[in-house]
Amino acid sequence: MYKRQTLRGDIENIHIGEGSNVQDGCVLHTDPGCPLKVGKDVTIGHLVMLHGCTIGDNSLIGIGAVILNKANIGKNCIIGAKALITENKVIPDNSLVVGSPGKVVREVTEEEKKAVWENTKHYQDNWKKYSKSIF
């Protein structure tokens, strides 16, 4: 968790999986019947809005993306910056999604999966390095 996020679990639960990171300016919120679940080793980029959705393991949600109630993002997905994922939308595993509304444009390559993991690992390493001086 970085600075200036808002997590509102006042209506339903919010679960953030081990190794995931939520960057500056994100808002995570729920509605009745719409809990929010973020899987393991997920990167939630700056200024992302997650609302009552599910994000699969090892995914990257790009800067400023919006994902709405009951949307389900599969594992190993990349959601592009500023993408809008509408309510009830199901994104299959290994998908690259861009646009507003978001559309699957192709499968994520092995090289991209590796880059997403390296990005996530970078944030995990930063947490280990700096958390001792922050808290």
Language-model regions, residue ranges each:
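Structural signal for interior beta-strand "rungs" in well-ordered beta-sheet cores
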Residues: K3-V97, G102-V104
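Terminal amphipathic alpha-helical/low-complexity segments used for targeting or macromolecular assembly
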Residues: K89-S95, S100-F135
